[in-house]
Structures are given as C-alpha cells and as structure tokens.
Amino acid sequence: MTLALRSIDAENYARIVLPLTAPLWAAGRDFESYTRQTLELARSGYGRTHYSTIGLYDGALLCASCKCYEREIRLGDRTLKAIGIGAVFTPDELRGRGYASAMLAALMDREHAVGSDALYLFSDIAPAFYEALGFVAFPSRVFSFRSDDLPHARMSIKQATPEDRAAIRRLFSRHERSRPWSLKRTPLYWEWIYLRTRHGSEHPGDDALTFVLREGSRVDAFVTGVRSAAHDSFIVDEIGIRDERERDLIAPFLRSAAGDLRRIVGWLPPEPIRRMLPRGTIRRRKDAIFMVAPLTRAAHAWVRSASGAGSGDAVWSTDHI
C-alpha cells in the first residue's frame, strides 16, 4: 500500500466526492444546488487563489478527502500562515482504517515543509481524535439570553445596504485590531463570506440579515444573523459597535434585531465584544470545536498563550469552514 496526497480539481471533486458527502453536508439543498454552490465558491476570487481540495490516494483509490483554506493570523506585529481544514471525509466502506488520520498527518508534514505555521479545523466529533494528531482545542462556547430580559429602547434600526459594507468592515476591523491575535480578513475573504451567506451555508432555510444603527450616514453599530422561527431565536453571527463607550446600546439593539423572537443566541464572540454582551447563559459547544495544530516554534508559543486566555472565544461563527 502506497498512500499519497493529491490535489483534486473542483470539477472532479464535485463529480467524485460531492455525491458521497451530500447526505452529510447538503443541509437540505438538492444535489444540483449543492454542486452549483460548491463550484461557485471554488471559482470565486478567494476560491481560485486560497482554496483547494485534496485527497489521500492508494493508487487510483480515493481513501479520504478534505478542503483546505489559506488564512493568515495577525499576532501582534507578526503574521502567521495558517491552513484551515474542512469537510474531512472517508467513504463508508473505508472507515476505521486510519485513512483520515494518515491524510491529516501527511498534510501537516507537507504544510510544515512549505513554511505554514499551523493547521486549524472545527471538530464535530470528540476532540480526542484530533488531539492525538497534535491539535489543541480552544474554548468553544455559545451564549443565550431571553429577549424579554433585555432593556427596550426606542431606536431606529435598518437593514444594511451594500453601501454600508465599508463602514461595517471598519467597525469589525477596529475590534479585531484590539485583540492580541485574530484571523485576518482580506477583501477576497469578505467576498467569500458574502457568497457563503447568500448560499445559506451556515443557516440553511433562513435568510441572513444585517441590521445597522445609523446616525445620518454614520454606522454606529451592526449585527449580522438570522431570525429563525424554527428555533424561536435570533442567531447572532457578528456584531460591532463604533464607540465602546456606548456599549449600553448593544442590549436594546439586539432586542430590536430579534423582533418578536423569544431568545437571542450565538457563538460566544471574541473580545472586546464578549465583555459588552448582556449577562446570559454560556455553555460549551458540542460541535464546531475550534482546534489548532501548531507546526512551528512561533505557532507553538501562540497556542500556549492563546488557547486558554481571555473570556471570549477565539473566532467568529463566520470563520467556520
């Protein structure tokens, strides 16, 4: 048996792998839509330059596959190169033979050789599987509070327009720069997020909404999420505020964004937004657990200091892959 990593181009990935993964990840989409949207992502600006699909082969036999996403980590004044791993898959008839582990180990070796600092992923299974390969779990939590427990204030919130995007990006970037580290967002990655949002990748069946609190042409706050009638909840993806001294705006702003839904929920956001949230229930996530495998000395030092630091989580739900 000779195992080897090979690239799979987007069309062959759609032809060979997607029919197998659709029951897991099509999320209610018909197969035609699932395939079309996957190819659209691969052909996007970010997809053409920073996204790839690979397989572990034994001769001509595809034993396992995954998606790779190139990102950069801002660590103070330094930049680390990271590779996100998603859609780790082994065909049913080949499971239990260690192919997924072999693929990830080979990928770690390859990326270390070309100068990458770390791999990361979001685990939907017990972290022990990935910990055995060298991944470290970061705190991964969700928050929840009742809408009726939040103060009500008369405020005129509006749905964001495309003209608001630049202001929203500035607010988001301001918060991210105040953190010790964060995943960088390039213009191409922002476009990738917008495309995945239009696809409903994270919230199938619900329309994503972005609300802004605007003073004239100035955006003072924004929140992105979905109003999910099925869960009777407003699910928050991202939130930002122009002036942290106005943090008392956040609670009534979220209540207004929730409309008549009973609860407001979401991934626990990173600092500084985490400390501005109203008091509520916080619990560990059972899925999408953020994990990092450091490959270099700099990445090992970062993971040691960051994996248990701070009261907020490490990443936003929009970073999920």
PLM ranges: what are they?
Residues 1-70, 80, 84, 151-192, ...:
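Short amphipathic alpha-helix that is part of the acyltransferase structural core
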Residues 48, 63, 69, 86, ...:
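Core nucleotidyl-transferase/polymerase catalytic module
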Residues 53-55, 61-71, 84-89, 212, ...:
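Conserved beta-strand in the GNAT
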Residues 85-95, 235-246:
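A short, internal acetyl-CoA/4′-phosphopantetheine-binding micro-motif in the GNAT/acyltransferase core
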Residues 94-106, 244-253:
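Conserved acetyl-CoA pyrophosphate-binding loop and the N-cap/start of the following alpha-helix
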Residues 109-123, 259-270:
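Conserved GNAT acetyl-CoA-binding A-motif
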Residues 128, 134-152, 226-229, 236-244, ...:
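Active-site/acyl-donor-binding loops of N-acyltransferases
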Residues 136-238:
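Amide-forming acyltransferase catalytic core, primarily the GNAT-like/NAT-type
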